[in-house]
């Protein structure tokens, strides 16, 4: 996959991924709407949960590969064309904020036990701490590019021209920025995936199906560009 087309290739992947995603969301909606008499078996519920998590993981694995090859196009992944304008209003390091999962859990499940609530509360604190770590590292990368020598060289571009060594310094700074942004993106995506997985581990299969249904619907809302043409 050439550097110049990594984001384009990922956009094509997302189009196919969304087709499969709609199918999974329909399955989750159906499973969560059945009463106890008609509900699918526990094994079928567990299988559906596992399949959906694997499906979501595939998205982030493909994204990781694309970001790793993106080169200059890494910046595209922070305001991606496969997200609609609604999604871009709430982007956090290129996707949804991991702690949003806890809000979605609250609105999806009304029968959490006290033990489950305590575990989720502990996980929420851990997730928010890790979110701060991601943002701290991201800020340090941005700060390194804003250092006076680099900014001076950047201002000379297209103006009076750069003196000896400044062009190399600027190129090196941009490489550091791109690598740092890619690392921040990957760390954020890992936190997104692990947070969903850990929440699901706390829930029963019927509860997990309800939460994943809501998360799946959010994925559609963020990524379905057809909404903008509706």
From Swiss-Prot:
Induction annotation: Induced by abscisic acid (ABA) and salt stress (NaCl). Up-regulated by ZAT18 upon drought.
GO molecular function, a single term: sequence-specific DNA binding
Recorded superkingdom: Eukaryota
GO BP: abscisic acid-activated signaling pathway; DNA-templated transcription; negative regulation of abscisic acid-activated signaling pathway; negative regulation of cellular hyperosmotic salinity response; response to abscisic acid; response to salt stress
Residues covered by the DOG1 domain: 7-230
Record keywords, A-Z: Abscisic acid signaling pathway, Activator, Stress response, Transcription, Transcription regulation
InterPro entries cross-referenced by the UniProt entry: Seed_Dev/Stress_Resp_Reg, TGA_domain
Disruption phenotype: Decreased salt and abscisic acid (ABA) sensitivity.
Reported function: Negative regulator of salt (NaCl) tolerance probably by enhancing abscisic acid (ABA) sensitivity.
Other remarks on this protein: Loss of function contributes to the increased salt (NaCl) tolerance of cv. Sha.
Name by which UniProt lists this protein: Protein RESPONSE TO ABA AND SALT 1
Species: Arabidopsis thaliana
